[in-house]
Amino acid sequence: MFKELLKKCLRGESLSAEEAEKIMNDIMNGKVPAAQIASVLTILTYRGETVDEIVGFVRGMKNNMNAISLEELNVVDTCGTGGDGASTFNISTASAIVASAAGVKVAKHGNRAVSSKSGSADVLEHLDIWIQGNEKEVKNAVADLNMSFLFAPLYHPAMKHVAATRKELGFRTVFNALGPLANPTNCTKQVIGVYSIELARKLAEALVVLGANHVLLVAGRDGLDEISATDVTDVVEVQGNVITEYTLAPEDVHLQRGKLEDLVVEDAKSSAELIESLFLNKSNVTAKNAVVLNSAAAIYVSGNVSTFEEGVAVALETIESGAAYTQLQRLKSKKVVEHAQ
């Protein structure tokens, strides 16, 4: 079956959602040789994935993940496709902490660095924040601390079947886009950083089919897969089955536009140091504004505020009042979660 679908791709034809789901199921179950996986990933990257293919691939990944039920907690995820090559500090991770300090329930999905200098798991280790290892720990952390970190390999063990091939290929594949759409909690409220507006549009259409509630897909024109504090950001907003596209600049919400170099770090350790100084109100303004903008997005999609600008005000207050730093200290304490068990 896989070979027939591969031949279909070679003929330049696209796959239906059902066919894409079948391909992903076979890949996730270790039924496909590495050479054939490489072939289909290369073909799809060259011609671009269709919305139906993305929908099917996401369903296939979800069929094979270790899911966690957090529907009653109404969680939000802040996750990016990664690979922007900008070597910035972990903006989405810092933003998740701020949003959780502001009362948003966050289930942050992430991994170690692949092409970047610091993955979300790497910086959390340097911040001494405990990474939960099972469903009970995750539920307790979200309920008691408003935040849990979902380390992707624990919930997507079947990805081991493509890890070596992805590394050998050395370029972005559909899996970069699929990761943020396959949160183990099946959350429907997200902020997803992507590397291009074209991809954002495709993912938005796929998210409508997959049942998203409220999602912001963001692509900074400076190349960041975040809401940019240094340039204009293209935004594709999904609310139910309604898709809206617009741009956002820092000055639109009364924030100063900064320089990209103010966001660059050497490694996970320096990323953690910048985040800690930011929460102590000692960082540069650009770093602070980057976190404010992305925190505001998470607060907005959570439904805790009605507009993005209201989210900015809440994020600013959360950082400047010291609430974000207090939350950081709470997240560092394993005893809070362990006691809840």
Swiss-Prot record:
**Cofactor(s) the protein requires to work:** Mg(2+)
Q: Which InterPro entries match?
A: Anthranilate_Pribosyl_Tfrase (IPR005940), Glycosyl_Trfase_fam3 (IPR000312), Glycosyl_Trfase_fam3_N_dom (IPR017459), Glycosyl_Trfase_fam3_N_dom_sf (IPR036320), Nuc_phospho_transferase (IPR035902)
Q: Which family does it belong to?
A: Belongs to the anthranilate phosphoribosyltransferase family.
Gene Ontology, cellular component aspect: cytosol
**UniProt xrefs under HAMAP family:** TrpD (MF_00211)
Amino-acid positions noted as binding Mg(2+) 2 in the UniProt annotation, renumbered to this chain = D225, E226
Q: In which pathway does it act?
A: Amino-acid biosynthesis; L-tryptophan biosynthesis; L-tryptophan from chorismate: step 2/5
Q: What is the lineage of its organism?
A: Bacteria, Bacillati, Bacillota, Bacilli, Bacillales
Binding positions (Mg(2+) 1): S92, E226
Q: Which residues bind 5-phospho-alpha-D-ribose 1-diphosphate?
A: 80, 83-84, 88, 90-93, 108-116, 120
Entry EC no(s): 2.4.2.18
- Its source organism is Priestia megaterium (strain ATCC 12872 / QMB1551) (Bacillus megaterium)
What does UniProt give as the signal peptide span? none
- What is this protein for, i.e. what is its function? Catalyzes the transfer of the phosphoribosyl group of 5-phosphorylribose-1-pyrophosphate (PRPP) to anthranilate to yield N-(5'-phosphoribosyl)-anthranilate (PRA).
Its BP terms in the Gene Ontology are:
L-tryptophan biosynthetic process
Q: Which GO MF terms does the UniProt record name?
A: anthranilate phosphoribosyltransferase activity; magnesium ion binding
> Where does the chain bind anthranilate 1?
G80, N111
Binding annotation for anthranilate 2 = R166
Question: What do we know about how this protein assembles, alone or with others?
Answer: Homodimer.
Give UniProt keywords alphabetically.
Amino-acid biosynthesis, Aromatic amino acid biosynthesis, Glycosyltransferase, Magnesium, Metal-binding, Transferase, Tryptophan biosynthesis
Q: Which reaction does it catalyse?
A: N-(5-phospho-beta-D-ribosyl)anthranilate + diphosphate = 5-phospho-alpha-D-ribose 1-diphosphate + anthranilate
- Presence of keyword Amino-acid biosynthesis: yes
The protein's name is Anthranilate phosphoribosyltransferase
Query: How and how many cofactors are bound, per the record note?
Result: Binds 2 magnesium ions per monomer.
What is any Pfam family matched here? Glycos_transf_3
